[in-house]
Amino acid sequence: MGDISYVVVFPTVFSKNKIPQLITNIKKILKIQNQEFKSVKRDGDVILVDANDPVFSSAAINLLFGIEKIAIARQVKNDFQKVVSEITTVGGNLLLKGERFLVKVEGTSKGFFTKDIEIAATSNIIEKKANMGARPGTEENFDKLLYTYLTKNNGYVCIFSDKGQGGIPYQSQNKNAICSVYDEISAISCFETIKQGFDSKIIICYRQKSELMNLVKMINQIIPRLVKQEVVLEFFNVKINQAGTRNYLIFVNSILEIMLHEAKSNNISHVSLALSPLVFSTNFIDYSMKRVFQKDRLPIMPLSGVDTKLFEEAKEIGLEKQIPKLEKLFQINSNEIQNSSNKDVDFALKSKKSITVRIGPNNVHDILDSLE
């Protein structure tokens, strides 16, 4: 076996029947990120990427949804001795002095149990790295995981692995949706809309220009996941007083009217509502959903059922410092249904500014410059 390292993509359980779409998205994201590759193909339940630069390619691929885990690994034939030998070599090179290690093997075994490989490889590493004080750990207590996955014909001994984004592949629903980003909750909802496989059109609603920097930074964490070289963003100025729960609810319902207008204009079937029963009253949610149905669109609520995991999503789009603000938003306590402001909706629609962003390292500055 040569010393070639591959990128190995592990689809989520929800994506295993959508692997062709995930392969398409992998090829697209590598081209967008200017990462050269020789092939992207399926091997059993995993996807094997032969890339010129596995490190940068794995980082690009891990922007995608539909992935449980991504690894850089060495390929070896699914043969007991060859797999044990490769784990011993790779694992030995990865270990530092005094580290506890855990050998974990999963997948399809032929003529042996995966546990047999784990035991044999662990024994070999202890013997060969005795001078380093390397010792086996347990499932609950280890410093380094030495992970290997077996397909029918091959074994993949991981040098590095990282957690994926979860969800299902972008565009796998074959439906389009409109979502709006106007604060932290709505940004997470937009992130979840894409994560649930919808082809998403994003609009940004702001009350004053001072909000734009923060909103654009959030957008910058979201748009690379749309698997497009260029993304069209639309900005609307919604001039509604920011103070108090009542005004916030008027603001949210006014944005709903803007989304409904844009959904009709662009023939978009689904409207993504940044609402959760954990935050908003049932009355408010029911009103919003009825408004969507009245306009012959279909509502989706990506945040429905998402509880404290919402904070993990917040960190994923760079909102660690905004978590106290999120917690404050969660304390909305009102059963009132505030109607949208027709005057402010009309003003916002007239203020619409559309810009095309070419995905790259300077997205934030490019977007803000285009809005001047």
What is the meaning of each model-derived region?
Residues 1-232, 239-245, 369-372:
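RNA-binding accessory domains that recognize and position tRNA/RNA substrates
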Residues 125, 133, 161-169, 173-174, ...:
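Active-site adenylate/phosphate-handling loop in enzymes that bind or generate adenylated species
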